């Protein structure tokens, strides 16, 4: 029976179809300009950019220029790149310009689509960011497309790992900047730790087009970007708290092995409060008062170290160090450390040397970074399954763009086996059969370990003609993936490997030409070689087509339907034939999630023998339902995390905006005076309560406060004895005395130096307090979940207490700045910019947990063991705070680094 919704869709088309149809009139208008645009000379075509910019200056909008600008960009693409965007690609570009997500299938030319929207938006001169998932793709796309943009008179920059600030600033100043999501986020964080506007590298967040938008804004968004630096040594605190845990009895705490959590009972909390009070570590009455957030965090870590972490199972002690053992592989992981002080708690437990913990200096999630752009758009082959998330979190619509040619790929029903071994044996049989008939095969796995296991089983079966590909070496993997369409090729790859590279039947022409013609001089020999490669690929493509096109074999279903669709979408590009099939077992992760035991007994009743598979559309539907449940759960988790991060984000925006204002302001004196006046008012209000008698005034406290914060010795006692004196009179006299003293100092220093001093003091104090605040919020977040047991909403509690902590930060800021400015003395020397702290960037891969930034080595970095102390030429780039390689024992900046500065 056809539903009413189905009848309506047949009559009027779906919302997506109506949206796509709405672009038809504009496409017709662009096509109508094609002949006239073709008739222009190269110079006249390039001159259109200046003409468009003038029209914008005269009041036209980008929307007004869309039709002529797209016509110009299309013609320039035809001349420079020898590619003419199809009508469906114009549709995709209009979706991007409109600030939405264009879902375009693999092979539909997303990179080319972006150029049209990029060109139009770059005309405004505010910068366009094209965001990719790795350095290789950023460099590749920038190198290819800069020819097109350069022809049209626009500049292109690229941001990858290892660039210095000057190179980054130059790249961001270009009309168009290609960059990875990680580099953009870290540059934003680093910029907001600088002390001078001229030191910053980014110039705003105008318009971004995110390639592989689902990967960056959904998958990668589960883990934040963090910049950390070393903290002060707190070994004594860890050792003191560690000594408390053995004094507790089993009734004092509750352990949940499954959830890996440890909590204190009421008796345990009481016992700890007494111990902490004796040690002078407890503030206030209760352990769970807001002032004790950090102590609670340390105590919880100590309890986990003793009761949840087992020596020689979770970690070993080697060479006076704690070395983590991977719970899945059983391998040691030297160099990896638990975060949030947990590693230090283990070091205290085992009585080894406690290494200083790293402090988060700054952090941001991708959700909050990308929401800063005035306009955001994205492209991917698979976004519709996450449409709700894109709409809710980013305000982005997902619009499916029709393919240029109909999809001919056959998606077969899943085959389900009882065990993983049976499944892999069936896959090996299928791979060999496809290889025999010359059909290219791409085998998708969910992890590097599964890839290695299948490769091992293939070799054992006597088959060695295959490539294994893991998402680690982007340039090498791009080449292997590009050749996976050669007849008979067998490529085993993790789902995420080779993103951004098309698998073309017969092989990728461009990749082969680039690799095989490298270093050849232009001439007849090069032309002949190029013609031979093109002819060979044409023959190979015909063979691959005759064998049925690319065959995608998936070894497991992923938690997300989107990842499965990505893998399927590798086959059947641009109307080519292809096949896809999923091989599953009841031991797969997803099957276990939704009750494989029940299914196992059911399959046995059906008489399923070893090595046999069940194939039925019902299985596919059941799996899809399970995937939808998991997707919904993951979305809820991300949404919940974002609610907490939004609290920090609102505060981050206030602090970063304040910093920017201070850096750009010509005169800071007014800000400093406002802070001073608020401190004075708070002091007087605290020690002289409203409507209190003179006998109730705390004159001694007021005098001490004035000395502490204002560096003044005022005759407050005499003032208090005067007949009819009121609190307002005291406030006025203290304010006048402080203002006079501050004015004298400003006159002595001179306006220029005073402004510099005020700016430096305020910025450095903000940074110091903000770092402490981030740590406090981290600690608060780690314990606030327990409020749920008391029937209180943890999120509301977190918001309220985070606000209290922020108010406290602002009070501390005013007091610290005032106290410092009223004491600072001028030493005759050239003012120097405050040094930035040592910084390390981290972004954990949400799937593997590996630190993506740990693999990058800064440009020109030389390992210490390869440096010759007597030959500075062998030292490479050296951090200013590193020990000098010459062996003097001094920091580089105080030794050989002095010559660089001179």
Swiss-Prot record:
Its EC number is 7.4.2.8. GO terms for biological process: intracellular protein transmembrane transport; protein import; protein secretion by the type II secretion system; protein targeting; protein transport by the Sec complex. It holds the Pfam family P-loop_SecA. Its cofactor is Zn(2+). It is a peripheral membrane protein. ATP binds at residues 89, 107-111, 502. Keywords: ATP-binding, Cell inner membrane, Cell membrane, Cytoplasm, Membrane, Metal-binding, Nucleotide-binding, Protein transport, Translocase, Translocation, Transport, Zinc. May bind 1 zinc ion per subunit. CDD domains: DEXDc_SecA, SF2_C_secA. Its main location: membrane. GO terms for molecular function: ATP binding; metal ion binding; protein-exporting ATPase activity. Monomer and homodimer. Part of the essential Sec protein translocation apparatus which comprises SecA, SecYEG and auxiliary proteins SecDF-YajC and YidC. Belongs to the SecA family. Part of the Sec protein translocase complex. Interacts with the SecYEG preprotein conducting channel. Has a central role in coupling the hydrolysis of ATP to the transfer of proteins into and across the cell membrane, serving both as a receptor for the preprotein-SecB complex and as an ATP-driven molecular motor driving the stepwise translocation of polypeptide chains across the membrane. This is Protein translocase subunit SecA. The lineage of its organism: Bacteria, Pseudomonadati, Pseudomonadota, Alphaproteobacteria, Hyphomicrobiales. The gene is secA.
